[in-house]
Regions:
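Beta1-alpha1 glycine-rich phosphate/pyrophosphate-binding loop at the start
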Residues: 40-119, 123-124, 206, 213-257, ...
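Low-acidity, Ser/Thr- and Arg-rich intrinsically disordered low-complexity segments
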Residues: 2-8, 12, 18-26
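Rossmann-like dinucleotide-binding core of oxidoreductases
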Residues: 200-257, 261-264, 275-277, 364-398, ...
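A Rossmann-like FAD-binding core segment of flavoenzymes
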Residues: 113-131, 223-340, 346, 388
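C-terminal, flexible cofactor-proximal segment of oxidoreductases
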Residues: 47, 378-503
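Short glycine-rich anion-binding loops that position phosphate/pyrophosphate groups of nucleotides
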Residues: 153-156, 219, 313-315
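FAD-binding core/adjacent interface of flavoenzyme oxidoreductases
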Residues: 33-47, 115-207, 296-297, 308
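FAD-site-proximal beta/loop scaffold in flavoenzymes
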Residues: 166-196, 289, 300-372
Length: 503
């Protein structure tokens, strides 16, 4: 090695060492972005890490609202799609395909360079280590965060009778909708083959439990499917003879709406041949039917092959987990009682939005999730920007929900809508429902095909998505049995400790 080359190496080392001493001595300590006072971040500080749990309305809209912020967003969800849940009943009744209401989350966020999508079921959120743990097919992923937005949604509630789920699927996932489509169409096919009148009547009886918006829409579409689309397609049976029953323990249809709107929906359903039974609680469900208890305590049985459960919701178990690690409480539905800024009490960098949050009696509807997700994203973006510019962290304003009204379809050309004190029924409400819902369908192609399918279904009698497979109908129960077998095998292979034998 030449002397000049060795000297240059020594000089370079000295200069580098002095520069590092100057940098480390002048760098100010960076407190949390969610503290008070002025924040001075180093020029080359790592971007703020935001983890979003859930790809529903709250999670997706929160992620998209951060697209122009200097943050790194990781969206963790158990599915690879964004689900437009209010239109699930149209997948179940053959109006829309699953792709039209459930686009790929990765494709939706493809052009958002600061967003990454991870598939996994979130099992833990640790405020101490600031990590989110998720599991996908046995692979455990731990994702660090500076802020987290929890929008894991809610599942179906059977009010402590989870065994009902085997016989009466809910309406919360694509799998639910596809299974219900299979059960509905298979019931008509089986009725065509039945020779016993009682068995045929059972196969042609459809019971929807829950007279909220989902139940009303589902009952109305099963009625129209049987009376319009399937009329004349069978030779032994007449699908128009199908019996559709709508049950609810409440005293009115559409409890969240004004009484006059609920009464309008009830009359319209009855004009379609739907039997509406109120003040009726379901006490038992099995393969062949269900038992109903009336308000006077008497019980009667309805023989029905196809049952749909839309009577209640229960928040994600992540709500109870967060409450156990903070000062938060949960309500009877498992929702977290959040602060006015949608954070978990004691955890100012953990936001909870959508169906998982409980605040001021807000309903579990899409608009609450969308506005909550955008609000949480805006708070994070404002505080990150203030920290980057060395300004005081802005005071958080409380979340304010802007009620844009509630809508529910009853049948084609008929819906109910309530916007503040204004109540609208019939064809005008139905047009409003169409416009609002197509606006929130993600992607131009999906909007276009949705409108086309609506035109074919509502103006004509065609439903283009009535194809069913054996897998759609049987997969959920088969997987459930497989899990039970795996659990039983694991229990057999678990060694017994001496103290257990002694006990």
């Amino acid at each position: 090695m030449s002397e000049s080359y060795a000297s240059s190496l020594v000089l370079r080392f000295v200069l580098t060492f002095r520069a590092s001493r100057v940098w480390s001595g002048s760098q100010a300590e960076t407190p949390s972005l969610f503290g008070h006072g002025k924040v001075c971040a180093p020029v080359n500080a790592a971007p703020h890490r935001v983890v979003v749990v859930g790809s529903g309305f709250g999670g997706l809209f929160a992620t998209k609202a951060l697209r122009r912020s200097d943050v790194e967003v990781t969206l963790v969800a158990r599915t690879a799609h964004h689900l437009f849940q209010p239109l699930l009943y149209q997948v179940a009744t053959g109006i829309l395909s699953e792709g039209e209401i459930a686009p790929s989350t990765r494709i939706v966020l493809r052009d958002q360079r600061n967003a990454n999508v991870l598939i996994g079921d979130v099992t833990d959120i640790d405020p101490d280590t600031r990590t989110v743990t998720s599991v996908h097919r046995g692979r455990v992923t731990v994702t660090p965060y500076d802020s987290v937005i929890v929008a894991a949604g809610a599942g179906q509630s059977y009010f402590g009778n989870d065994r009902f789920a085997e016989f009466a699927p809910g309406m919360k996932t694509l799998d639910d909708a596809l299974e219900l489509r299979g059960r509905i169409m298979n019931a008509f096919d089986a009725a065509e083959l039945a020779t016993d009148p009682a068995e045929r009547a059972r196969l042609l009886t459809f019971v929807v439990v829950g007279a909220g918006p989902t139940g009303v829409e589902m009952a109305g579409q099963i009625a129209e499917l049987s009376k319009r689309t399937l009329a004349g397609t069978f030779r032994t049976i007449d699908p128009r003879d199908a019996r559709i029953v709508l049950l609810d323990a409440a005293p009115k249809v559409l409890p969240p709406f004004a009484d006059s709107l609920g009464e309008h929906a009830r009359r319209r359903l009855e004009s379609l041949g739907v039997e509406v039974t109120l003040n009726a609680a379901v006490t038992d469900v099995d393969t062949d039917g269900l038992v109903v208890r009336a308000a006077d305590g008497t019980e009667h049985r309805i023989e029905a092959a196809t049952k749909v459960w839309s009577a209640g919701v229960s928040a994600s178990p992540l709500g109870a987990m967060l409450a156990s690690k903070s000062d938060a409480e949960i309500d009877r539905a498992g929702r977290v009682l959040v602060n006015p800024d949608l954070t978990v009490p004691g955890l100012p960098n953990v936001f909870v939005v959508g169906d998982m949050m409980a605040l001021d009696g807000l309903p579990g509807v899409a608009q609450v999730a969308i506005q909550g997700g955008r609000y949480a994203a805006r708070v994070i973006a404002d505080e990150v920007k203030a920290a980057a510019e060395g300004r005081p962290v802005p005071e958080r304003r409380p979340f304010r929900y802007r009620d844009k009204g509630s809508m529910a379809t009853v049948s084609r050309f008929s819906a109910v809508a309530q916007v503040g004190p204004v109540k609208i029924t019939g064809f005008l409400a139905w047009l409003m429902w169409l416009v609002v819902h197509v606006a929130y369908v993600v992607g131009f192609k999906s909007r276009l095909t949705t409108v086309c399918n609506w035109a074919w279904t509502f103006l004509g009698r065609t439903r283009t998505q009535l194809t069913v497979t054996h897998q759609q109908t049987e997969a959920r129960l088969a997987l459930g049995r497989l899990v039970s077998l795996e659990d039983a095998r694991a229990a057999r292979e678990t060694p017994v400790r001496p103290e257990q034998l002694a006990g």
